[in-house]
Amino acid sequence: MLREFVPEPAYSTTDEDTVFALLSRRAKRDPDDLIAQWQDDETRRWHDVTAGEMLERVRAVAKGLLGLGVKAGSMVVIYSPTCYEWGVIDFACAAIGAVSVPVYETDSARQAASIIEEVDPIIAFAGDFAHTQTLEQIRDEHSSLRYVFNFKADGLDAVADFGEGVGEDTLDQVISRVKADDMLTIVYTSGSTGKPKGAMLSHRNFTHIVLNGYIILDEMLYQPNRLMLFLPLAHCFARYIQYVAIGGQGVVGYLPGAKHLLADLRSFKPTYLLGVPRVFEKVYNAASQKAGAGIRGRVFAKAFDHFVQWSKDEQETGRHSIVARAEHSFFMSVVGKSIRSALGPNMRYLACGGAPLNVDLAHFFNGMDGITFIQGYGMTETAAPMIVNWQDANRVGSVGKPGPGMGVRTDDDGELQVMGPNVFLGYYKKPELTADVKMADGWLKTGDLGTIDDNGFVYITGRKKDIIITAGGKNVSPAPMEDVINTCPIVSHGVVVGDGKPFIGALIELDQEMVRSWLAQQGLDSNMPMEQIAKNDAVRAFIQQYVEKANANVSRAESVRKFEILDEEFSQEKGTLTASLKVVRPKVLKRYENVIDNVLYAPKPSNKPLPKTVQILDRTTETVKQASESMRQASESVSPKVRQAFDTMQEKIKKQTEDTGESQTPEDSSETEETTMNEER
């Protein structure tokens, strides 16, 4: 082992620290405290919920679940976008020891059926009528699924009605039997490296990082705050932050997605925003597009460089020159002010997780007045962020340090391993896969590569399974280059390829909305088909600038020599994106195998003239072939003896052709081999 860092726990969880206890303690402290808000579908008006009201609703639904035959250990499926009802069911299941099994709202009927078949639930909740129809079709084929309730058809009221015969004392007895080490949920991994697996997580897995998180990020997580929650609650990251806000002094604004993100930011006025990298890339890309070309575009580019450097200087020395201060005032007034305004007047923290984010983009946001950019690291198997930047120790570019009582170390290959009370129980019905990642000493193999500095800060360098080994034997991590390419406003995803190939290449997926807007700004046809856009010289030249930026950070052997722009978008339906918008690399490589092999790495026809010796042999061979054909035609009308003589001549000609050959001369072969070796070097 190269390095290990394990902080002492600031708070040791007890058996009573369940997820339901986070809500019940909050309601007991102040039942009139505002705890949640949800939007009306038609008017988009926010509706308030107090802590006491939410607790009362959760208890009523919990009694209804008991009335339906749900008990400790029973599986309850939730197939819905993020909404207040999702949160109520989550806490109701936690209260009675039932196991919630979330299904992403974007999962197909086949994917939902696969999960339901594996966990055998007796009850499922749907977010709308379409999800209800899917679940009812699945129910016809799975006898274990008895009940389907639709949130949009007053499903919670219907469930609560089944609890009329369940007394408060009975419910309290059931709640008291639930302990921190009991299973809380089965969360299916996003499947970015293969088939999704069901990770079993306990109450303690979550409550340990929630309660210790209040200590290291008190201002952001525990003090009165407002969280706009639009990430899918099927994702561990969103689930964790919901528990944080409910258990502290936060208000959760439940939203089904980010369709109206800017308008919702203005109306809800959050104090911090939780997002995956794509959210922040889109905010930056929108601002960059709005600036456009010309003077405004150049000012925006200068502002970007300034905010990045300001953040770096603040982090390293905390000092700025008089010139830098004057520039900062100017760039805040012409660029920073509008972005701050779009984020809302109360925004203080931006938190990013779920995947790596380009470090300069993180510095860009962090360099603006009043914004602290926080990065963290976690996975489904660790109940989300177990490594995070602390309030008094934030290093942009790092994912932070392990939280109290949690540890990180690297093995000899540079793979990160983690440990702590937050590490999952195992994969559901897959003990052999659990044994592959969960070691005998309690440490978990993450599959991610990284480094740990002297102060315990962790830096992610790539994904172990994503490492590309070129034909020349060079090991290349695609993540650093992809991070830079993805900052191009018209790019959704760049996927670096080259395993077993002579050089590194890339597939480029365009952001179709942004690229059409960009074309219009350039005075080009924005309505042309995507097939033409993908081949457009201006589009290619613009992306080339970002490829060159990426190449500037790596050696020639690691640089992208060639890229191909795709004319279609990645999607969950195609299998190329997970529900949390991560690229499923194996599926991308398989889907675009023909593009990779026959476009990116198509052998080039040689324009180099053949050496004179080869030209002479070539002409000789052609003359022999012509003579052979003439003799064949003549032989058709001669005697058998002459025909036999012709056949003998044919054999001699064939042997002569093989001896002279049309292949490369030794000189050419050596030259080609030397060129290839030079390119790989």
Predicted feature residues:
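Conserved AMP-binding/adenylation subdomain of ANL enzymes
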Residues: T207-K337, N346, M368
